[in-house]
Protein backbone atom coordinates (compact mmCIF):
# COMPACT_ATOMS: atom_id res chain seq x y z
CA UNK A 1 0.00 0.00 0.00
CA UNK A 2 1.20 3.56 -0.59
CA UNK A 3 2.80 5.24 2.39
CA UNK A 4 0.71 8.29 1.56
CA UNK A 5 -2.66 7.90 -0.09
CA UNK A 6 -4.29 10.58 -2.21
CA UNK A 7 -6.23 12.19 0.64
CA UNK A 8 -4.00 15.29 0.63
CA UNK A 9 -3.20 15.25 -3.08
CA UNK A 10 -4.94 18.00 -4.99
CA UNK A 11 -4.90 20.05 -8.15
CA UNK A 12 -2.61 23.05 -7.76
CA UNK A 13 -3.54 24.77 -11.04
CA UNK A 14 -5.27 23.54 -14.17
CA UNK A 15 -5.68 24.61 -17.77
CA UNK A 16 -2.09 23.87 -18.82
CA UNK A 17 -1.22 22.17 -22.10
CA UNK A 18 -0.07 18.70 -21.01
CA UNK A 19 2.78 19.89 -18.76
CA UNK A 20 5.79 17.56 -18.72
CA UNK A 21 8.16 19.59 -16.57
CA UNK A 22 7.78 21.50 -13.31
CA UNK A 23 10.38 23.44 -11.33
CA UNK A 24 10.59 25.93 -8.49
CA UNK A 25 12.58 29.11 -9.04
CA UNK A 26 14.72 31.19 -6.68
CA UNK A 27 11.80 33.64 -6.64
CA UNK A 28 9.50 31.00 -5.15
CA UNK A 29 7.42 30.83 -8.32
CA UNK A 30 6.48 27.49 -9.87
CA UNK A 31 7.42 27.03 -13.52
CA UNK A 32 6.03 24.63 -16.13
CA UNK A 33 5.92 24.17 -19.88
CA UNK A 34 3.34 23.17 -22.48
CA UNK A 35 3.55 20.91 -25.49
CA UNK A 36 3.01 23.76 -27.97
CA UNK A 37 5.78 26.01 -26.64
CA UNK A 38 4.02 27.64 -23.69
CA UNK A 39 6.15 28.68 -20.72
CA UNK A 40 4.17 29.14 -17.52
CA UNK A 41 5.04 31.02 -14.33
CA UNK A 42 2.72 30.43 -11.39
CA UNK A 43 2.32 32.39 -8.17
CA UNK A 44 2.29 29.84 -5.35
CA UNK A 45 0.09 31.78 -2.93
CA UNK A 46 -2.42 33.13 -5.46
CA UNK A 47 -2.32 30.11 -7.76
CA UNK A 48 -2.29 32.50 -10.70
CA UNK A 49 -0.92 31.28 -14.03
CA UNK A 50 1.05 33.61 -16.29
CA UNK A 51 1.98 32.42 -19.76
CA UNK A 52 4.99 34.65 -20.27
CA UNK A 53 6.99 33.10 -23.12
CA UNK A 54 6.84 30.67 -26.03
CA UNK A 55 9.68 28.46 -27.25
CA UNK A 56 7.79 27.25 -30.30
CA UNK A 57 8.05 23.55 -29.53
CA UNK A 58 7.48 20.65 -27.15
CA UNK A 59 8.74 21.74 -23.74
CA UNK A 60 10.06 19.08 -21.38
CA UNK A 61 12.34 19.65 -18.38
CA UNK A 62 13.68 22.95 -17.07
CA UNK A 63 16.11 24.50 -14.60
CA UNK A 64 16.64 28.06 -13.35
CA UNK A 65 19.61 30.24 -12.44
CA UNK A 66 19.94 32.79 -9.65
CA UNK A 67 18.29 35.54 -11.73
CA UNK A 68 15.26 33.33 -12.49
CA UNK A 69 16.31 32.83 -16.08
CA UNK A 70 14.78 29.54 -17.16
CA UNK A 71 16.59 26.93 -19.26
CA UNK A 72 14.05 24.81 -21.13
CA UNK A 73 14.59 21.58 -23.02
CA UNK A 74 12.48 21.88 -26.15
CA UNK A 75 12.59 18.40 -27.58
CA UNK A 76 11.30 18.79 -31.13
CA UNK A 77 13.50 21.82 -31.77
CA UNK A 78 16.63 20.00 -30.60
CA UNK A 79 17.77 22.74 -28.27
CA UNK A 80 17.85 24.17 -24.78
CA UNK A 81 16.37 27.67 -24.72
CA UNK A 82 17.07 30.42 -22.22
CA UNK A 83 13.97 32.34 -21.16
CA UNK A 84 14.48 35.59 -19.25
CA UNK A 85 12.02 36.78 -16.58
CA UNK A 86 10.78 39.27 -19.18
CA UNK A 87 9.94 36.42 -21.55
CA UNK A 88 12.79 36.87 -24.03
CA UNK A 89 13.77 33.55 -25.62
CA UNK A 90 17.19 32.69 -27.03
CA UNK A 91 18.95 29.46 -27.89
CA UNK A 92 21.38 28.39 -25.16
CA UNK A 93 22.69 25.15 -26.67
CA UNK A 94 21.86 22.75 -29.47
CA UNK A 95 24.59 20.24 -28.67
CA UNK A 96 27.87 19.95 -30.54
CA UNK A 97 28.75 20.06 -34.23
CA UNK A 98 29.62 16.37 -34.12
CA UNK A 99 26.55 15.43 -32.09
CA UNK A 100 23.60 17.82 -32.28
CA UNK A 101 20.82 17.45 -29.75
CA UNK A 102 17.90 15.41 -31.04
CA UNK A 103 15.55 15.11 -28.05
CA UNK A 104 16.88 17.18 -25.14
CA UNK A 105 14.83 16.05 -22.18
CA UNK A 106 15.99 17.43 -18.84
CA UNK A 107 18.59 19.92 -17.52
CA UNK A 108 20.15 20.21 -14.07
CA UNK A 109 22.63 22.79 -12.76
CA UNK A 110 25.57 22.26 -10.48
CA UNK A 111 26.90 24.96 -8.18
CA UNK A 112 29.43 26.22 -10.75
CA UNK A 113 26.80 26.81 -13.42
CA UNK A 114 27.43 23.71 -15.49
CA UNK A 115 24.15 22.54 -17.00
CA UNK A 116 23.86 18.77 -17.43
CA UNK A 117 21.38 17.86 -20.16
CA UNK A 118 19.97 14.45 -21.00
CA UNK A 119 19.35 13.76 -24.66
CA UNK A 120 16.94 10.83 -24.70
CA UNK A 121 17.27 9.79 -28.32
CA UNK A 122 14.55 7.59 -29.78
CA UNK A 123 12.47 5.01 -27.89
CA UNK A 124 14.45 1.75 -27.95
CA UNK A 125 16.92 3.42 -30.28
CA UNK A 126 19.86 3.14 -27.88
CA UNK A 127 21.04 6.50 -29.19
CA UNK A 128 20.81 8.83 -26.19
CA UNK A 129 23.63 10.71 -24.50
CA UNK A 130 24.33 13.31 -21.84
CA UNK A 131 25.79 16.77 -22.44
CA UNK A 132 27.28 19.40 -20.22
CA UNK A 133 26.81 23.05 -21.14
CA UNK A 134 29.30 25.35 -19.42
CA UNK A 135 28.21 28.76 -18.18
CA UNK A 136 29.58 30.36 -21.36
CA UNK A 137 27.45 28.05 -23.52
CA UNK A 138 30.30 25.75 -24.53
CA UNK A 139 28.84 22.27 -24.93
CA UNK A 140 30.43 18.84 -24.67
CA UNK A 141 29.17 15.27 -24.70
CA UNK A 142 30.20 13.77 -21.36
CA UNK A 143 28.47 10.37 -21.46
CA UNK A 144 27.44 7.96 -24.21
CA UNK A 145 27.40 4.83 -22.06
CA UNK A 146 23.93 5.47 -20.69
CA UNK A 147 22.16 5.59 -24.03
CA UNK A 148 18.84 3.78 -23.45
CA UNK A 149 16.58 6.80 -23.10
CA UNK A 150 18.20 8.92 -20.36
CA UNK A 151 15.31 10.94 -18.98
CA UNK A 152 15.11 13.16 -15.90
CA UNK A 153 18.29 14.01 -14.03
CA UNK A 154 19.39 15.73 -10.83
CA UNK A 155 22.67 16.78 -9.28
CA UNK A 156 23.03 15.32 -5.79
CA UNK A 157 22.76 17.84 -2.94
CA UNK A 158 26.51 17.56 -2.27
CA UNK A 159 27.26 18.23 -5.93
CA UNK A 160 29.27 15.03 -6.29
CA UNK A 161 27.01 12.95 -8.53
CA UNK A 162 24.64 13.23 -11.44
CA UNK A 163 21.62 10.96 -11.00
CA UNK A 164 19.74 9.96 -14.14
CA UNK A 165 16.42 8.17 -14.65
CA UNK A 166 16.97 5.59 -17.37
CA UNK A 167 13.57 4.74 -18.80
CA UNK A 168 14.56 1.57 -20.66
CA UNK A 169 16.58 -1.65 -20.72
CA UNK A 170 16.28 -2.01 -17.78
CA UNK A 171 14.36 0.85 -16.19
CA UNK A 172 16.61 2.10 -13.41
CA UNK A 173 18.19 5.05 -11.67
CA UNK A 174 21.91 5.38 -12.26
CA UNK A 175 24.51 7.83 -11.06
CA UNK A 176 28.10 8.77 -11.86
CA UNK A 177 30.55 11.17 -10.22
CA UNK A 178 30.98 14.62 -11.74
CA UNK A 179 33.57 17.36 -11.34
CA UNK A 180 33.87 20.67 -13.18
CA UNK A 181 31.35 19.61 -15.79
CA UNK A 182 32.94 16.23 -16.48
CA UNK A 183 32.10 12.62 -15.76
CA UNK A 184 34.98 11.45 -13.56
CA UNK A 185 34.10 7.88 -12.63
CA UNK A 186 32.09 4.79 -13.52
CA UNK A 187 28.32 4.52 -13.68
CA UNK A 188 26.59 2.86 -10.73
CA UNK A 189 23.08 1.45 -10.57
CA UNK A 190 21.22 3.00 -7.62
CA UNK A 191 17.98 1.07 -7.99
CA UNK A 192 16.36 -1.07 -10.68
CA UNK A 193 12.71 -0.38 -11.44
CA UNK A 194 11.07 -3.25 -13.33
CA UNK A 195 7.66 -2.65 -14.89
CA UNK A 196 7.74 1.14 -14.55
CA UNK A 197 8.94 4.03 -16.71
CA UNK A 198 10.92 6.36 -14.42
CA UNK A 199 10.98 9.97 -15.52
CA UNK A 200 11.67 12.69 -12.91
CA UNK A 201 13.82 12.98 -9.77
CA UNK A 202 13.83 15.15 -6.65
CA UNK A 203 16.06 14.93 -3.56
CA UNK A 204 14.81 15.26 0.02
CA UNK A 205 16.66 16.64 3.03
CA UNK A 206 16.55 13.26 4.81
CA UNK A 207 18.75 11.65 2.15
CA UNK A 208 15.91 9.96 0.28
CA UNK A 209 14.80 10.89 -3.22
CA UNK A 210 11.60 10.72 -5.23
CA UNK A 211 10.99 9.21 -8.66
CA UNK A 212 7.99 10.26 -10.70
CA UNK A 213 6.92 7.56 -13.14
CA UNK A 214 5.36 8.20 -16.51
CA UNK A 215 3.94 4.66 -16.26
CA UNK A 216 2.19 3.65 -14.08
CA UNK A 217 0.74 6.71 -12.33
CA UNK A 218 3.06 6.51 -9.35
CA UNK A 219 5.60 8.50 -7.36
CA UNK A 220 8.22 6.30 -5.72
CA UNK A 221 10.63 7.04 -2.89
CA UNK A 222 14.10 5.57 -2.46
CA UNK A 223 15.12 5.62 1.20
CA UNK A 224 18.67 6.42 2.34
CA UNK A 225 19.30 2.70 2.90
CA UNK A 226 18.26 1.96 -0.70
CA UNK A 227 14.85 0.50 0.03
CA UNK A 228 12.19 1.35 -2.54
CA UNK A 229 8.74 2.44 -1.38
CA UNK A 230 5.59 3.85 -2.98
CA UNK A 231 4.86 7.42 -1.92
CA UNK A 232 1.67 7.93 -3.92
CA UNK A 233 -0.21 5.82 -6.43
CA UNK A 234 -3.29 6.62 -8.49
CA UNK A 235 -4.75 3.69 -10.40
CA UNK A 236 -7.38 6.00 -11.91
CA UNK A 237 -4.76 8.33 -13.38
CA UNK A 238 -6.63 11.49 -12.45
CA UNK A 239 -4.65 13.32 -9.75
CA UNK A 240 -1.49 11.55 -10.88
CA UNK A 241 -1.93 11.52 -14.65
CA UNK A 242 1.38 10.34 -16.14
CA UNK A 243 3.40 12.26 -13.50
CA UNK A 244 6.56 13.06 -15.39
CA UNK A 245 8.43 15.44 -13.09
CA UNK A 246 8.44 16.45 -9.43
CA UNK A 247 9.80 19.32 -7.36
CA UNK A 248 9.47 20.79 -3.89
CA UNK A 249 8.32 24.36 -3.32
CA UNK A 250 6.53 26.53 -0.81
CA UNK A 251 8.18 28.68 1.86
CA UNK A 252 10.24 25.83 3.37
CA UNK A 253 10.31 23.44 0.39
CA UNK A 254 7.80 21.15 2.11
CA UNK A 255 5.16 21.19 -0.63
CA UNK A 256 5.45 18.54 -3.32
CA UNK A 257 4.45 19.47 -6.87
CA UNK A 258 4.22 17.23 -9.91
CA UNK A 259 3.55 17.70 -13.61
CA UNK A 260 1.00 15.51 -15.39
CA UNK A 261 1.85 14.96 -19.03
CA UNK A 262 -1.34 12.97 -19.49
CA UNK A 263 -3.61 15.74 -18.25
CA UNK A 264 -3.89 19.52 -17.91
CA UNK A 265 -2.89 20.30 -14.34
CA UNK A 266 -0.09 20.45 -11.81
CA UNK A 267 -0.60 18.42 -8.65
CA UNK A 268 0.22 19.39 -5.07
CA UNK A 269 0.63 17.58 -1.75
CA UNK A 270 1.57 19.67 1.29
CA UNK A 271 1.40 16.76 3.74
CA UNK A 272 4.09 14.28 2.71
CA UNK A 273 6.23 15.01 5.77
CA UNK A 274 9.20 15.54 3.46
CA UNK A 275 11.25 18.60 2.58
CA UNK A 276 13.12 19.14 -0.63
CA UNK A 277 16.88 19.55 -0.69
CA UNK A 278 18.01 23.00 -1.77
CA UNK A 279 18.65 23.31 -5.50
CA UNK A 280 21.59 24.97 -7.20
CA UNK A 281 20.73 28.38 -8.68
CA UNK A 282 24.07 29.51 -10.12
CA UNK A 283 24.96 33.02 -11.20
CA UNK A 284 25.36 32.66 -14.96
CA UNK A 285 25.90 36.38 -15.55
CA UNK A 286 25.43 37.53 -19.11
CA UNK A 287 26.23 34.14 -20.61
Residue ranges and their predicted role:
Residues 38-40, 79-81, 128-131, 172-174, ...:
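A short loop-to-beta-strand structural motif that recurs across blades of beta-propeller domains
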